[in-house]
UniProtKB/Swiss-Prot annotation:
Pfam families: Histone (PF00125). The modification N6-acetyllysine is found at K8, K9, K15, K24. Residues 1-47 are annotated as: Disordered. This is Histone H2B. PROSITE patterns: HISTONE_H2B. There is a cross-link at K8, K9, K24, K25 (Glycyl lysine isopeptide (Lys-Gly) (interchain with G-Cter in SUMO)). The keyword Nucleus applies. InterPro entries: Histone-fold, Histone_H2A/H2B/H3, Histone_H2B, HISTONE_H2B_site. The keyword DNA repair does not apply. The gene is HTB1.
Length: 138
């Protein structure tokens, strides 16, 4: 028997606005209350880099905006690069029989994955960030 029109729920749970901070995923549950009615599912939260991408955009081009589609593409790009670097760093640690990924493995994996000048700039910015973190942690 097909569901009644009143029982349909809108499917906006998976969408996140472009300027929101990274969020955690939570599993939503439907449970039956004493009256026999179903409770609404809690919205699942999605982790994104949207707020960070937006902050960098405003530093570089303060008067420029970004569409949700472009934000989604950039978020996928960041996730892809992050996964590639992490996988390569994991392989390097395994080759050297180490159980810990250090900044050295990350740096080497960035040099292997990114081409030429882009790798040099990435290593430079990464070194600068690690130095800044180390000096503030003391």
């Amino acid at each position: 028997m097909p569901p009644k029109a009143a029982e349909k729920k809108p499917s906006t749970a998976g969408k996140a606005p472009a300027g929101k901070a990274p969020e955690k995923k939570e599993a939503g549950k439907k449970t039956t209350a004493a009256g026999g009615e179903k409770k609404k599912r809690s919205k699942t939260r999605k982790e994104t880099y949207s707020s960070y991408i937006y902050k960098v955009l405003k530093q570089v081009h303060p008067d420029t905006g970004i569409s949700n589609r472009a934000m989604s593409i950039l978020n996928s790009f960041v996730n892809d690069i992050f996964e590639r670097v992490a996988t390569e760093a994991s392989k390097l640690a395994a080759y050297n029989k180490k159980s810990t990924i250090s900044s050295r493995e990350i740096q080497t994996s960035v040099r292997l994955i990114l081409p030429g000048e882009l790798a040099k700039h990435a290593v430079s910015e990464g070194t600068k960030a690690v130095t800044k973190y180390s000096s503030s942690a003391k």
